């Protein structure tokens, strides 16, 4: 069953300006070490950060909290499955909120779709609760 849906659009130009103005102060506040390493080794650095920023916003919406109620930017990390498919790893307040959304005997599966078509980046997040025997 679906327990949360979120989407977000992010202007890549805004992220590029923020990177120019605030650099590491911005990236260290919003992104995990792994996300920074992945984005910083690419030529399209702003696009990578914008996709991840949109994913975090979409996840916060899917959790039903936004970036409040103890959910912080770095509680949500965009990672890739072995197949290359993006997903989210949650920690701290985001993981706690996710646990509150799940019915007893269910585990979460987070579905993430990321795209960009400059100047915009977009993300969708769906939180699915699956019975533990199926989620395995």
From Swiss-Prot:
Q: Its GO biological process terms?
A: fatty acid biosynthetic process
The encoding gene is: acpS
Annotated keywords: Cytoplasm, Fatty acid biosynthesis, Fatty acid metabolism, Lipid biosynthesis, Lipid metabolism, Magnesium, Metal-binding, Transferase
Keyword Chloroplast assigned: no
User: Could you tell me which HAMAP family the record lists for this protein?
Assistant: AcpS (MF_00101)
* Native organism: Methylobacterium radiotolerans (strain ATCC 27329 / DSM 1819 / JCM 2831 / NBRC 15690 / NCIMB 10815 / 0-1)
The subcellular location is:
Cytoplasm
NCBIfam families reported in the protein's UniProt record: acpS, pantethn_trn
Q: Reaction catalysed?
A: apo-[ACP] + CoA = holo-[ACP] + adenosine 3',5'-bisphosphate + H(+)
Q: A single GO molecular function, which one? A: magnesium ion binding
**Family from the record:** Belongs to the P-Pant transferase superfamily. AcpS family.
Any idea of its EC number? 2.7.8.7
Where is it chiefly localized?
cytoplasm
- On the tree of life, the source organism's domain of life is Bacteria
Per the record, its GO cellular-component terms are: cytoplasm
Entry function: Transfers the 4'-phosphopantetheine moiety from coenzyme A to a Ser of acyl-carrier-protein.
- Cofactor(s) for this UniProt protein: Mg(2+)
The residues listed in the UniProt record as binding Mg(2+), with positions renumbered to this chain, are 8, 57
Alphabetized InterPro entries for the sequence: 4-PPantetheinyl_Trfase_dom, 4-PPantetheinyl_Trfase_dom_sf, ACPS, Ppantetheine-prot_Trfase_dom
Name of this protein? Holo-[acyl-carrier-protein] synthase
């Amino acid at each position: 069953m679906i327990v949360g849906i979120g989407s977000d659009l992010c202007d890549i130009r805004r992220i590029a300006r923020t990177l120019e103005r605030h650099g590491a102060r911005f990236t260290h506040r919003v992104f995990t070490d792994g996300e920074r390493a992945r984005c910083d080794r690419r030529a399209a650095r702003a696009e990578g950060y914008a996709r991840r920023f949109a994913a975090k916003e979409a996840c916060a919406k899917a959790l039903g909290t936004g970036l409040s109620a103890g959910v912080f930017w770095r509680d949500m990390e965009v990672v890739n499955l072995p197949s290359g498919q993006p997903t989210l790893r949650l920690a701290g307040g985001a993981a706690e909120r996710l646990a509150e959304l799940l019915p007893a005997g269910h585990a979460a599966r987070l579905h993430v779709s990321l795209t960009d078509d400059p100047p915009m980046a977009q993300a969708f997040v769906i939180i699915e609760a699956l019975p533990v025997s199926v989620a395995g």
